[in-house]
């Protein structure tokens, strides 16, 4: 007999611990947005590990719109996320494909901006992001998806740095849903540090 699956709260707590230990750093950093910060979050050590990917797939899937047929995101941060969510959906017997949005059109072949099984025009797509600061990466992905004819109204991120990203996304008629806010990850990192 296999053990019972962990509760959603246990998964959420484990994911927060993993992000605090493996993704969060305190120091002096220049962010992708060009801003300076004392906090840095690189989710890839978690999103590129098998166990982290499993946790993220389940956690993010919960916030994908029920009528979405795809999840998509800008390469590179969203690549493992869209794959994990599509797999978690399949395991839950839900059809949900993954798309990767290129930062620029492919320079050969089809010159495509999007990679993956393309849904019909007008389909709803939920955008996934690892970290939202200003919202620039998400907005670039959304722009390409909307220009291709897809309906995008929600962005789901692992961490919202709370530095204007939500406001920028709201201005583009997008709802931002975050698993965690930066202060939650930073606080958990401090707690874990004092425990050792």
From Swiss-Prot:
Reaction catalyzed: orotidine 5'-phosphate + diphosphate = orotate + 5-phospho-alpha-D-ribose 1-diphosphate
GO MF annotation: an example: orotate phosphoribosyltransferase activity
Top-rank EC class of the record's enzyme: transferase
Residue positions binding orotate: 133, 161
Essential cofactor(s): Mg(2+)
Gene3D superfamilies: 3.40.50.2020
EC numbers on record: 2.4.2.10
Residues given in the record as 5-phospho-alpha-D-ribose 1-diphosphate binding sites: 102-103, 106, 108, 129-137
Pathway where it operates: Pyrimidine metabolism; UMP biosynthesis via de novo pathway; UMP from orotate: step 1/2
Domain of life: Bacteria
One annotated GO biological process: pyrimidine nucleobase biosynthetic process
Keywords associated with the record: Glycosyltransferase, Magnesium, Pyrimidine biosynthesis, Transferase
CDD domains the UniProt entry points to: PRTases_typeI
Quaternary organization: Homodimer.
Annotated function: Catalyzes the transfer of a ribosyl phosphate group from 5-phosphoribose 1-diphosphate to orotate, leading to the formation of orotidine monophosphate (OMP).
Record-stated family: Belongs to the purine/pyrimidine phosphoribosyltransferase family. PyrE subfamily.
NCBIfam families per record: pyrE (TIGR00336)
Protein name, as recorded: Orotate phosphoribosyltransferase
Organism: Prochlorococcus marinus (strain MIT 9313)
Species lineage: Bacteria, Bacillati, Cyanobacteriota, Cyanophyceae, Synechococcales
Name of the gene this protein is made from: pyrE
């Amino acid at each position: 007999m296999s053990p019972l699956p962990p509760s959603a709260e246990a998964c959420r707590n484990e994911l927060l611990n993993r992000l605090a230990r493996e993704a969060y750093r305190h120091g002096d950093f220049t962010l992708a947005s060009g801003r300076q910060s004392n906090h840095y979050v690189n989710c890839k050590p978690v999103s590129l590990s098998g166990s982290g990917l499993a946790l993220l797939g389940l956690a993010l899937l919960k916030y994908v719109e029920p009528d979405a047929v795809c999840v998509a995101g800008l390469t590179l941060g969203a690549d493992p996320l869209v794959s994990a969510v599509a797999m978690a959906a399949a395991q839950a017997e839900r059809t949900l494909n993954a798309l990767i949005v290129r930062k620029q059109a492919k320079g050969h072949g089809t010159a495509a901006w999007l990679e993956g099984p393309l849904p019909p025009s007008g389909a709803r797509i939920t955008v996934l992001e690892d970290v939202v600061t200003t919202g620039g990466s998400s907005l670039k992905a959304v722009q390409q998806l909307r220009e291709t004819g897809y309906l995008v109204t929600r962005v789901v991120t692992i961490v919202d740095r709370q530095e204007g990203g939500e406001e920028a996304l709201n201005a583009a008629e997008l709802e931002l849903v975050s698993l965690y806010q930066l202060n939650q990850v930073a606080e958990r990192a401090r707690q874990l540090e004092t425990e050792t």
